């Protein structure tokens, strides 16, 4: 059964069990919640055209796999105190959550920011498997993917096998993403 389980705003609020999980992290409005809905084939996550709507960690069960939708980073129109709070619990979750076995960084294919590059650098320091997922491939020409892929590969020495291409909106390649999630968790 595909379902929303719970929200959390700190590590102590997270589900307290030993089930393995993966998380989706990315800038605000990059499509993380849309990906959740696409993987579930149902609207179990709230989506919005307004960036910064997800301000909690949201736990879902999809195809018997636990997936956590993390708040987006980089949105400028929330209070500084709220930004700091989100940043703190994201850091706490990524560094200390024992259930976390995989991180999927969701990037907008057309726009790679310095903050995205910093997050990739952070992922390389964690003892958790990670993948870079370029979303919105339906919106951009192939040249955008080639340019941004090269930017990531060159700047960070990331292996190409860590990169996935999807369109959450059109559900393109979501099956490949789900297979990778299952592989990471098992």
UniProtKB/Swiss-Prot annotation:
Record CDD domains: YihA_EngB
Residues reported in the UniProt entry to bind GTP: 26-33, 52-56, 69-72, 135-138, 166-168
Swiss-Prot/TrEMBL cofactor(s): Mg(2+)
Keyword GTP-binding attached: yes
Gene this chain is encoded by: engB
Any one GO CC term of the record: cytosol
Family matches, as Gene3D superfamilies: P-loop containing nucleotide triphosphate hydrolases (3.40.50.300)
Record keyword Magnesium present: yes
Protein name: Probable GTP-binding protein EngB
Secretion signal, residue range per the UniProt entry: none
